[in-house]
Amino acid sequence: MSLSVFDLFKIGIGPSSSHTVGPMRAAVRFVEGLRREGLLTATTCVKVELYGSLGATGKGHGSDKAVLLGLEGEHPDTVDTETVAARLQEIRGNGRLNLLGEHSIAFNEKEHLAMIRKPLPYHPNGMIFRAFDAAGLQVRSREYYSVGGGFVVDEDAAGADRIVEDATPLTFPFKSAKDLLGHCVKYGLSISQVMLTNESAWRPEAETRAGLLKIWQVMQDCVAAGCRNEGILPGGLKVKRRAAALHRQLCKNPESSLRDPLSVLDWVNLYALAVNEENANGGRVVTAPTNGAAGIIPAVLHYYMRFIPGSNDDGVVRFLLTAAAIGILYKENASISGAEVGCQGEVGVACSMAAGALCEVLGGTVQQVENAAEIGMEHNLGLTCDPIGGLVQVPCIERNAMGSVKAINAVRMALRGDGQHFVSLDKVIRTMRQTGADMKSKYKETARGGLAVNIIEC
């Protein structure tokens, strides 16, 4: 299966790629199917059931809100985040949904949107959408699964190897890190050059570069918003946003702070906190590769652009291409879903992607890039997903800052070596998948274990 850099990096809305972006995409796909089959105007009722992890933590992750917006025709990359609250208030206050913005039906959330903790067979993040006509007859029903990073598959793809419906032939196909590095060594290419060549199967190189710089701009906008916005995050935990205050501290006396040899890490922490606070607030973010881990790649990329001499837009493009190549390996051979393998599949994967990407733009060999990516995951193995209150706040926000610093340190270790390392990237990916399979479900985005049950919500 062919995956693009833009499958890994998607502009979306917080707080969760699997629990917000995925359900919104599934909902709009369902109603678009109604219109395509000529059933939209005949529909008088839509019922939605969210299963497994979606049912357990969907409220905290905004899955219910995402479904309502998706049924009204909104897409994660274009929905106006400033008007979401008002839109939802109108839907709930009037008791009506405007399907695709063109067909109004009655909607009672208590009757028509159910959250069920029991999972469907294929994946912990399952959904069933049903449409009925005026006679109460079911006219359409579809199952969807949000499999991480905003990826959605329907019941026809469930259980199959297919991730997205794309069989585009690539110049340098790869299913493993061994394959990827083999292309690099054989043709004298970097990982980013392999990816850029493959991207030409879908679009001209100039379009790919422009698209990646747009992704980078959204990341910068997200950091800027996080450094500007203050207050309490939604959801009931009363978590205070910290990035704006930290930003003021760092800007107040930047010269004196740089006398501290570790002060750069304060900026890295800031970038990660800013992104994940925006994400927790339902703001505009880039899946990288998920929303729960969306702060790591922007933080490390900001570190590169601000603190590395000679950094430029070409480096940004190379960084994102390399990160995507590594992310594809995890997506195809393991998982990037916290509900499937725990947080090692989100923060762990993002750390690995960022480490490999930074290593390339700092001049690392392909062997050193692989080493950095492997280190990034090896020391996140077993990381649980246990969000307090089902919210993407504690421990998620700080965990992105820790993952960002860990990625930078992984690169420093790799660049001090010759590229030879004991554990291969393929082996650590396989280990992550096996560890996730062995992990109890209470540690996989259900809010029924770990910090989620040991910290009292106040």
Place the predicted regions along the sequence by residue:
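C-terminal regulatory domains involved in ligand/effector binding and gene-expression control
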Residues: 76-256
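Extended hydrophobic packing segments that form well-structured cores
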Residues: 422-458
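Conserved phosphate/anionic-ligand binding catalytic regions in large, soluble enzymes, centered on
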Residues: 9-27, 281-300, 341-352
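Short, mixed-charge aromatic SLiMs
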Residues: 45-58, 90-97, 246, 319-333, ...
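Hydrophobic alpha-helical bundle architecture
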Residues: 311, 322, 328-401, 413-422
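Alpha-helical support elements that line or immediately flank enzyme active sites
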Residues: 18-35, 298-310, 355-363
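Accessory "access/gating" subregions that flank catalytic or transport cores
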Residues: 205-342, 450-458
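Short alpha-helical scaffolding segments that buttress acidic/His motifs in well-ordered protein cores
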Residues: 8, 12, 268-276, 319-327, ...
